[in-house]
């Protein structure tokens, strides 16, 4: 059943005519605004009612738009009521009474391609669902390209486009499986390294040249044996690691070390310096006790009893793996300087 055709004639009632004018005028300005925004154009709308009242609308500025109007002598398009009536009648006859505002058919719409996303389980998508989604998207894109090319009349181009899309999607599918195996399958990297052994063997050569420049290894990279150190260095190295039960063993080490050393000269006697302005307490500190251990002179500096004794005539260098005879000892006798 066709739609009833509406006759556009003058409204006889004055009140109804004013109401219709107000509504249609606002609708006309609204359409002009939409046209100016959507199509980026300038519009000047001038309306006089039945009592010669002026109503105007301009998208930017009326004077600027009218100035552009006066600059053009020949308008690109000019229509009157008769032209519009003919267009409306022709449109209603073709479309069966349609009331669409646009005369153009609008942009052509291509078939909608719907791609199903893979289901996510516990924050991770399964390999089968991702692979099926990739293959489905590849087939859909290839079909769409073939359909568009067929519409344009290029069958050979459609086949070439479909083949290219299938090749690219196959490579993408291969890369997708590789990434998923690297992320979700820890054992995959081991097999991947076994397959890429020729590549790894070729990369060994440049790394061997750079191995010549080695930094000092950390202390945790090798076992630190203090048995070959000098006794004092060994005691310093083991001070935080050796329990109190090894105090006797340390003293035995010192005894054996002192027995292996040659007999040194006795320490020079230090005269009493109290006559030089030094108190007796200070002179007692400057005149240490000299005792003997296994036939060797040993200097006793006082204070708490240490697990070992110091030999005053022996030069000991506090460095690991460094012999005591690295630098010569000053053998000349020294005397404390007098205070003036």
From Swiss-Prot:
Induction line: Down-regulated by microRNA mir-1. Up-regulated in many head neurons during prolonged starvation.
Biased composition (Polar residues): 258-268
Main location per the UniProt record: nucleus
InterPro entries referenced in this protein's UniProt entry, alphabetically: MEF2-like_N, TF_MADSbox, TF_MADSbox_sf
Annotated segments matching region Disordered: 90-112, 193-217, 258-283, 312-340
Organism domain of life: Eukaryota
Basic and acidic residues compositional bias, start-end: 318-332
GO molecular function terms attached to this record: DNA-binding transcription factor activity, RNA polymerase II-specific; histone deacetylase binding; protein dimerization activity; RNA polymerase II cis-regulatory region sequence-specific DNA binding; sequence-specific DNA binding
Stored SUPFAM superfamilies: SRF-like
Segments forming domain MADS-box: 1-61
Effect of residue 38 to F: In oy63; Suppresses several phenotypes in a Ser/Thr kinase kin-29 mutant background; dauer pheromone hypersensitivity, reduced chemoreceptor gene expression and also decreased body length
Summary of the function given for this chain in its UniProt record: Transcription regulator. Binds specifically to the MEF2 element, 5'-[TC]TA[AT][AT][AT][AT]TA[AG]-3' in the regulatory elements of target genes, such as chemoreceptors str-1 and srh-234. Involved in transduction of sensory signals, together with egl-4, kin-29 and hda-4; binding to histone deacetylase hda-4 enables negative modulation of chemoreceptor gene expression in chemosensory neurons. In response to starvation, negatively modulates expression of chemoreceptor srh-234 in ADL sensory neurons, acting in concert with basic helix-loop-helix (bHLH) transcription factors.
Protein name: MEF2 transcription factor homolog
Organism: Caenorhabditis elegans
């Amino acid at each position: 059943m066709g739609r009833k055709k509406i006759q556009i004639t003058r409204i006889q009632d004055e009140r109804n005519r004013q109401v219709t004018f107000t509504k249609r005028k606002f609708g006309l300005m609204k359409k002009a605004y939409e046209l100016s925004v959507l199509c980026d154009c300038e519009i000047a709308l001038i309306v006089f009612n039945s009592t010669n009242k002026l109503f105007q609308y301009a998208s930017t500025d009326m004077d600027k738009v009218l100035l552009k109007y006066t600059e053009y002598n020949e308008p690109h398009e000019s229509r009157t009521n008769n032209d519009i009536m003919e267009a409306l009648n022709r449109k209603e006859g073709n479309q069966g009474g349609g009331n669409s505002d646009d005369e153009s058919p609008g942009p052509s719409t291509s078939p909608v391609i719907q791609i199903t996303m893979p289901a996510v389980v516990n924050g991770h998508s399964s390999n089968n669902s991702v692979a099926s989604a990739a293959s489905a998207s590849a087939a859909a894109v290839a079909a769409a390209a073939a359909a568009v090319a067929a519409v344009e009349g290029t069958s050979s181009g459609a086949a070439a486009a479909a083949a290219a899309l299938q090749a690219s999607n196959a490579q993408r599918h291969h890369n997708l499986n590789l990434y998923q195996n690297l992320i979700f399958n820890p054992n995959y990297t081991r097999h991947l390294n076994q397959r890429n052994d020729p590549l790894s063997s070729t990369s060994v050569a440049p790394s061997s040249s750079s191995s010549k420049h080695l930094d000092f290894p950390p202390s945790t990279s090798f076992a630190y044996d203090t048995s070959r150190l000098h006794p004092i260095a060994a005691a310093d190295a083991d001070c935080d690691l050796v329990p109190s039960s090894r105090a006797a063993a340390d003293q035995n080490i010192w005894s054996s070390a002192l027995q292996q050393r040659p007999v040194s000269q006795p320490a020079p006697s230090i005269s009493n310096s109290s006559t030089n302005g030094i108190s007796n307490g200070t002179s007692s500190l400057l005149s240490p006790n000299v005792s003997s251990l296994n036939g060797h002179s040993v200097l006793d500096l006082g204070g708490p009893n240490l697990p070992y004794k110091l030999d005053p005539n022996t030069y000991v260098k506090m460095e690991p793996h460094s012999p005591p005879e690295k630098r010569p000892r000053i053998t000349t006798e020294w005397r404390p300087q007098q205070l003036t």
